[in-house]
Amino acid sequence: FKGVVAASYGRIYFKNLIGRRTSESTALNFIANGEGYLGQHTLATLMFALSSYEPPAEVMESYHVPAEGRITESAEGEEKVHLYSYRTPDYVMGSVLDYHPGEPGSQEHVLQVMIKDCDTQIWINHPGEAVYFGEGRPGYFAGNGTLPLIRQDKNCAVAEFHLLDQEVQYTHAFCPLEQFSEWRLEGRWLFLKKDNICAAVYADNGIWITDKGPLKNYELVSPGKDNVWKILVEEESVYGSFEKFIHKLHQNGGKER
């Protein structure tokens, strides 16, 4: 999406999640398609740039997304892990479905949303440690202490958590509010707008925006061992306005799908 990987990962680090422009894969995308960023990782980038290799036509075609969006599903690895992604020209939502829910996690990145660019992103996880920028595997934002059950249908995803007896007894979302042109917290809902795209984040146990420290306006916290998060992304034109988007979700109780 826009030249960066925006999907579930089997192994992730916080520095990679927030530093999308620095990954080697984005430089490869830049050379192949003109989208992405050139960084300081040069091994594969240099070999690709100097070689005569040209990606197959089907790979190049995958860069182009129709206006109505595209669903991509695959089974990866020895366990045939079910990866699901829905991508439009303006946003992408990707997840791993039914991956060991309720079991201890590691560095799996299980749910990811990007809107318009690689800086406007949202993901939900259970912190594997209480230290913000520690060395734990899983960490505070990278990976999950307890893995959730995830379901996704195109632009809507649900993450159901039942936490084990671990250090952190809440779940949270990374959500940089400064990247959005408008946002509004109403009850258990956080509504957001970025240009022509609307998004809604919901948690059964309520949402609190971290209002101090290094994560001020970057973190959404929801308490409790048992919790359900929902996230929906849609074009504003589908509803007519941001206000109508909010009204519709309140009216339907979030049951858009």
Name each model-derived stretch.
Residues 2-257:
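Ser/Thr/Asn(+Pro)-rich, low-complexity disordered segments
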